[in-house]
Amino acid sequence: MTDVLARFNSGKLWDFDGGIHPPEMKSQSNQTPITKAPLTEDFYIPVKQHAGDAGNLLVKEGDYVLKGQPLTQGDGLRMLPVHAPTSGTVIAIAPHIAAHPSGLSELAVHIHADGKDQWREQNPIDDFLSQSAEQLIEKIYQAGIAGLGGAVFPTAAKIDSAQKKVKLLIINGAECEPYITCDDRLMRDNPDEIIEGIRILRYILRPEKVVIAVEDNKPEAVQSIKNALQGANDIEIRVIPTKYPSGAAKQLIQILTGMEVPAGQRSSSIGVLMQNVGTAFAIKRAIINDEPLIERVVTLTGDKIPNKGNQWVRFGTPISFLLKNVGYQYDERLPVFLGGPMMGLTLPNLDAPITKLGNCILAPDHFEYDPQAREQSCIRCSACSDACPVHLMPQQLYWYARSEDHEKSEEYSLKDCIECGLCAYVCPSHIPLIQYFRQEKAKIWEIKDKAKKAEEAKLRFEAKQRRLEREEQARKLRSQRAAEARREELANQKGVDPVKAALERLKQKQAAITEKPKISALKTVVNEKGEVLPDNSEVMALRKARRLARQQAISTENSVLTQVDSGTQSDNSDVQKNPENSTALDGKKAAIAAALARAKAKKLAQNNTESVSDNVTAVKSAVQNTEISAPSDSAEKTETDPKKVAIAAAIARAKAKKAAQNNTESASDNVSAVKSAVQNTEISAPSDSAEKTKTDPKKAAIAAAIARAKAKKLAQQQSNKTE
């Protein structure tokens, strides 16, 4: 920074590479003082008129607004508000044609003027020294002031970021465009207010040096500023050679200090800050007069305009309205430019409004304007590179822009292009290089903006997730605390924790349902010899329990069989005593004995456990096997066979009864008939002669088997018929 001041204090003027001296046409419009443009009936104020984001709307359709009333509200120093240019009613808030070569629309507030031009309440101050630097920066921000030299960067943000870094404050009055004279006339007509605005900036920034730089083709403006200073030495004036584009910020710094601003950095990095003379004037009006930025000086020039000059124009005024008031006659063959011939934009629609960016309306005639020649191929002549004041390679950037190679465009420093138009001016192939560069910049900006928004959305989502997690944890913690407090309260009242008691009951219930005898982990014992052997005591205990259950089942079955046997023996004795009545009595007694056996067996089966039932089944099975094998036994066992025959008959009758219950009534009758036959067979068996008694048990068993088979067959037939 010391080098900057040392170089500036040397009084030397440096030069920059490139640049041209185009024909000068300033005399068309700088011969008369600035006048006020008449007010139109309808204003269209774009909500975004600066380099940054649009503010939030404060008005709605149907609202009545006063002159200077804010229409939007910013959120941060780079989101500038816009203000009502006059009093009137908000007709609509809708897209309106923009002052851009694309012809696209942008959101604007449509105000219908009431003709009163009534100001909102104002609070002017006489002495800005009574305010702090922060208060002054806030006033500049609330006034919506942006750089009026062409960049329209928010002034408050620029000043705030450069505080305590600035050693040299440069006020740019070079105005190098060949047709534009708005700054020239402003310095001639309002030098005192410009000086007052510069002193406000000096008070905020506290630089060591302040200088006003003016090109040598504006002698009247230089003299006017000197007269306003009245010999004060706090502000210097430096007259620089006329050369395009000496009014560009980096080129003017190089002329005054011989230093270049590093690529990708701001001038404050070397201790320099630059403001336009129009911006200094707007700062004075905002601080001293409490007037927001609602108008600016606009140069109306070109041979198609009879009444050339500079006018104070309110923002939102349609360009067509301005041109009509200065005698312009529309000609579709000749374009109208917003800005100068070097950096200006072609307007496809003259209904676009004047904004903070609009410093000149140029309407040339056919003597001044040559139609765009047909674009030809690049011949690699390097004329564009030689003329470029920032040492770029426009021919390479041209190829990358055409092929949309965004990475290469950035690699070759497209962002450092100041869009001065020199490359297109000197190109022998008539290639509109600036158009290609602007389009490429817009595409790169759009890609980065989408990536930025995606990253911001990701950060917002992650922040939301963290917030939701914190809220969920806090909710769970509150619930736990409330539950603990409730349990403590109940425990204090009853002496027992209800939750723990409920859990204990649930565990006991589940254990009772699912409890089964389990063998614990393998245990070992040491015998007398010192050998380690497995401890099978639990397994042996389980086996013993199962064995006792089987024995109990067998004993129960034996008791049933004993009762049946005793009944059979008594029947046989009665038959032997009364042979005449044996046929009638044996059948009845056998039926009674069988019924008693069935009842006792059923009762015992209901009272015993499942294990006992299984053992009973096994015993019955063994008994049946004994029945089948009975005929093959020796003659010595034949005397006890009648008992088994009676058991077999009882089993046959039980099976017949079960089959009868599952089948139809007719099947039941047939089964009953079979049972009667079986009974008759059993009854008639003892009445045979004494010689046949030894063989009767076998025949009885065979007859019982045949009866069972017939009963089963009849039951199956009846079931099939029923189906």
From Swiss-Prot:
Biased composition (Polar residues): 559-583, 661-687
UniProt GO BP: electron transport chain
Main location: membrane
Domain of life: Bacteria
Keyword Transferase belongs to the record: no
Binding, [4Fe-4S] cluster 1: 378, 381, 384, 427
GO molecular function, a single term: electron transfer activity
Binding residues annotated for [4Fe-4S] cluster 2, in chain numbering: 388, 417, 420, 423
GTP-binding recorded as keyword: no
Note on cofactor: Binds 2 [4Fe-4S] clusters per subunit.
SUPFAM superfamilies per UniProt: alpha-helical ferredoxin, Nqo1 FMN-binding domain-like
Entry's localization field: Cell inner membrane
A GO-annotated cellular component: plasma membrane
Family classification: Belongs to the 4Fe4S bacterial-type ferredoxin family. RnfC subfamily.
Protein name per Swiss-Prot or TrEMBL: Ion-translocating oxidoreductase complex subunit C
Native species: Mannheimia succiniciproducens (strain KCTC 0769BP / MBEL55E)
Encoding gene (name): rnfC
